[in-house]
Amino acid sequence: MAIMKKFIHHSLKQLIKPNLTSTKRVVSTSPRKEQGVAAISLEPSEMAQCPFRKSIDTFTETTNAVKAPGMTEVQPFERIPGPKGLPIVGTLFDYFKKDGPKFSKMFEVYRQRALEFGNIYYEKVGHFHCVVISSPGEYSRLVHAERQYPNRREMVPIAYYRKQKGFDLGVVNSQGEEWYRQRTVVSKKMLKLAEVSNFSTQMGEVSDDFVKRLSHVRDSHGEIPALERELFKWAMESIGTFLFEERIGCLGQETSPMAQTFIANLEGFFKTLQPLMYNLPTYKLWSTKLWKQFENYSDNVIDIGRSLVEKKWHPCKMEVTQNLHLISYLVNNGSMSTKEVTGLIVDLMLAAVETTSSATVWCLYNLAKNPQVQEKLFQEITEAQAKNNGTISAEDLCKLPMVKAVVKETLRLYPITYSTSRNIAEDMELGGYTIPAGTHVQANLYGMYRDPSLFPEPEGILPERWLRMNGSQMDATIKSTSQLVWGHGARMCLGRRIAEQEMHITLSKIIQNFTLSYNHDDVEPILNTMLTPDRPVRIEFKPRQ
């Protein structure tokens, strides 16, 4: 027994071993006193002292936290309501109970916790602990309090893998000045509408080929077997035009072996990442079966990304054209090394393929379930064609109000990222409580987007709520909160403009060519790192006459 205790104690010390190599990164290390014992984060921290030896009075009420207007008294952090948990593991064991909360339904957990505890609550799940905000106004205050280097919680398994392998952390997981340097270079190319729209013609050609492929792969019922995988192929082919300005080979009768390998490993990557995000990071002590799977998928994805970058690197140095694809732009800019560019390209391919395909399948599902919305979109496209002598460019398709509204409404109902977050840089008041610097704060997007006090008829599909022509008087704070699915501020999703352009073009072209219907049991969301359907989405694609 004594030997076992010694082993457990040693293991926990290793898990919480300080990270002395990253002194500029703000890490969420704010424990809260529960049941007389401080809840300890198992994240690598910058505290040289073992947390087990620290006083349980690590955090006390902070007197210099700024109060919100109208607040008469700010409550201490320890009084934030939330589910009771055990020392060290918090509520982790609850998630393994048959009738307990599930990691695959974390978005529903946030929603139900908010109904139980209110617009602000605290929970510790294993090594992951955070304050969850369900008020647009309160989270808006956090957004406006950001500094030059906003700190977002790193995706620990990815960061740990890359550090172990000696790879660049990438713009997604890096922090501080290093993040800012890379972000500044890339955002000039990726977040300007004018830059992204330069590739609308190529993306339109990809969408045309995708529509042809859908016609080819329809079964006898008019359905697309493995629609989600077909959307993976389309998203990968489309992002390739922006990253490399070349076709990868996903949409032919035979998908290229490289594309098949990448897609298969990408699916495995996200499925293994999800459980690693919340469980105790035991993979830092020994290589678990799940970690080995994640590592293998990551190795393969990195290898493909590296090969694509190396293939384009030297030819790019010869290019001097104005509308450079991303790698050419980065090579000619000269601010990032090959290693950094590889990390960035892999991040973009991972995010672009999974995010865009998941969002698009939800859009198609909503259109198939709501023929009246589908018809309005078709009429809008038809009228726009009539005004342009029967033709309409991919760039013009991106400007159609209804297709934009359909995408916004879909992401409200099925936010692919069910939460967005920050590690706050300084003590502040949120929801009437003192929140210490370094605390991880998340916005409960899924819960807010389905709150009837914020969005009337929240379970329905009402794209009209986003149309200015309807005289919508949506509150400015609520409207801005609705876009948090793409992140916010300086750390907004780099691929947002590209993903929106891809979806606007492709959805319009699909509705131009097909009538969609869905005649099966309702699809429910499930969490595979992102919000994805819990079953194959069997939509009937009926060619229009």
Curated annotation (Swiss-Prot):
It comes from the Eukaryota. Transmembrane segments: none annotated. Its EC number is 1.14.-.-. CDD domains: CYP24A1-like. Abundantly expressed in the female gonadotropic hormone producing dorsal bodies. Keywords: Heme, Iron, Metal-binding, Monooxygenase, Oxidoreductase. It holds the Pfam family p450. Heme binds at C493. The keyword Cytoplasm does not apply. GO terms for molecular function: heme binding; iron ion binding; monooxygenase activity; oxidoreductase activity, acting on paired donors, with incorporation or reduction of molecular oxygen. Coiled coil: none annotated. Its cofactor is heme. May be involved in the synthesis of the female gonadotropic hormone produced by the dorsal bodies. PANTHER family: CYTOCHROME P450. Belongs to the cytochrome P450 family. This is Cytochrome P450 10. It comes from Lymnaea stagnalis.
